[in-house]
Design a protein with these regions (language model features):
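Conserved "HGTGT" condensation-loop signature of ketosynthase/thiolase-family condensing enzymes
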Residues: 1-106
C-alpha cells in the first residue's frame, strides 16, 4: 500500500470561503443553515439550507468563463486554488496530484 499525504486543504462552504474562516466558524459552534435567499422557495416545503452566498466567481474566472462553467465547478476551482496555495505548490506535476471532493449537491 502506498502512503498518501495531505499537503494542502481548500474549503468553501456556507460557513466560510476558505479553510481559516470555515474552521473558525465550526469551532465557534456556528451553523451555515439559514433561510434560502438565492431563489424563490414559496413552492417548496423546505425553506432553509446551507447556501454559499458571498462567493464571487469573477474573482477567479473571467466573464466568459463564468457563464460557461457551472457553479459547482466554480466552487471546486476556488477550493482547489486554495489547496494548491496551502500546499505551497511551485509547479504542477499531474502524476503526483490527487483531489478528494465532497459536496451536498453538485
Amino acid at each position: 500500500m502506498k502512503r498518501v499525504v495531505v499537503t494542502g486543504i481548500g474549503m468553501i462552504n456556507a460557513l466560510g470561503l476558505d479553510k481559516e474562516s470555515s474552521f473558525k466558524a465550526i469551532c465557534e459552534g456556528k451553523t451555515g443553515v439559514k433561510e434560502i435567499t438565492s431563489f424563490d422557495v414559496s413552492d417548496f416545503p423546505v425553506k432553509i439550507a446551507a447556501e454559499i452566498t458571498d462567493f464571487d466567481p469573477n474573482s477567479i474566472l473571467d466573464g466568459k468563463e463564468v457563464k460557461k462553467v457551472d457553479r459547482f465547478i466554480q466552487l471546486g476551482i476556488q477550493a482547489s486554488n486554495e489547496a494548491m496555495v496551502d500546499a505551497n505548490f511551485k509547479e504542477f506535476e499531474a502524476h503526483k496530484f490527487g483531489v478528494s471532493s465532497a459536496a451536498g449537491i453538485g
